[in-house]
Amino acid sequence: MKYKVCILAAGIGSRMKPFTEHINKSLLPVNFKAVISHIIEKFDTNIEIVVAVGHLKETVIDYLDCAHKDRKFTIVEVDRFTGKGSGPGYSLMQCRDHLDLPFIFFASDTLVLEDIPPPAENWLGVSPVIETEEYCTAKI
């Protein structure tokens, strides 16, 4: 099945301050590599990756151009990445015109250690959290 990957890297990373005042949270290093690179490298080079950018967007775009020259990226500039009405849902909606295939969604501050298989069908993964006001929520 052909699919895409969508990475949201638009937010200000408020829970990671002061580290994110001058660097986008997707570029924070983990084991000497930017978080976003850990995500990108989970997928074959022929998979198109849609990246939503906002906060310090130029640094993310420049990094992707330098670190992942062999990849095809579609960059979506999110116009509202802080304040009322912003958030992952809004950023994902800004990407919708570029998500014309099944896709795997990643928040740019999420690391997954396991290999990620291509999607064979539609599914949604969620996880319970205690402090729901700090995260995106889904009512099931």
What are the language-model segments listed below?
Residues G11-G13, F81, D109-L111:
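Short glycine-rich anion-binding loops that position phosphate/pyrophosphate groups of nucleotides
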Residues L113-I140:
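Conserved core of the sugar-phosphate nucleotidyltransferase
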Residues E58-T59, L111-L113:
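Short, active-site-adjacent cap segments at secondary-structure transitions
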Residues M1-I7, R15, P29, K33-P102:
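Conserved N-terminal catalytic core of the sugar/cofactor nucleotidyltransferase
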Residues A9, V53, A107, S127:
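Short beta-strand/turn micro-motifs composed of small residues
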Residues E21-S26:
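Short alpha-helical oligomerization interface
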Residues L101-L111:
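Short beta-strand-to-loop acidic/aromatic patch adjacent to the donor-nucleotide binding site
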